[in-house]
Amino acid sequence: MIEDMYEEKNPLGYFDNIRMDVISFIDKPAGEVLEIGCGAGGTLSYLKSNGLAQHVVGIDIASSQIEVALRQGVDEAFVSNLDDLEEILHGRTFDAILMLDVLEHLVDPWSVLKRISGFLRPGGRAYVSLPNVQSVRVLVPLLMGQWRYKELGILDKTHLRFFTKRTAVELLRGAGFELESVHHKLESHTLPRLINFLTLGVFKRYLTVQYILVGRI
């Protein structure tokens, strides 16, 4: 079962990240925040404890992580594969929804994101992160005839969909969002960042490992 595949990722630290890269773009406090794919709840707990959210709700497919999230101070947390999202949330709406490294794992991220938009209050924001399949990490091996799935990263073996910047933007707009901003998460190594600086960003799309998109309803 797919749930078991995610439970197996736990020893890799897959669920433990506090997404400071995304939090840095949350420019004002929100009342209620929902995170889909909340893992162990680190990001939600940080938002609440630092005054960026009053009430935080998490959803994840891995039951073991939901237990951790509740212990970390997440107000409400549910186990779900998103099929029963409407039943769980009972028509509730939120000021912000986080979907960080989630949509690429879904068979139909387009329809899911449209459903998610219905849980946002007017003026609410969605924060979405997606890996960049146009990264040099993928393109160089591909030119040599290699496409190897891995435990983590852009070619994570649980990824079902792949996006470039253009198709990521189309995904949000197609779901009814007004795109506020797109942020490039560059390779962490010094050399790619230096190349990007020296070339004035000409090769930025190839040196980006992930896009963070902010959309408003």
Spans of features found by a protein language model:
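Short glycine/proline- and charge-enriched loop/turn segments
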Residues: 4, 144-154, 194-197
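A short beta-strand submotif of the Rossmann-like class I SAM-dependent methyltransferase core
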Residues: 96-102
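Short N-terminal helix/helix-N-cap motif within the alpha/beta-hydrolase-1
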Residues: 107-111, 138
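A structural helix-start
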Residues: 106-107, 130, 134
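Conserved beta-strand signature within the Rossmann-like core of class I S-adenosyl-L-methionine
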Residues: 124-130
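A short glycine-rich, Lys/Arg-flanked "PGG" loop and its adjoining helix->strand segment in the class I
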Residues: 111-122
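Conserved N-terminal segment of class I S-adenosyl-L-methionine
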Residues: 1-92, 96, 110-113, 130, ...
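Acceptor-substrate binding/catalytic loop of class I
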Residues: 150-167
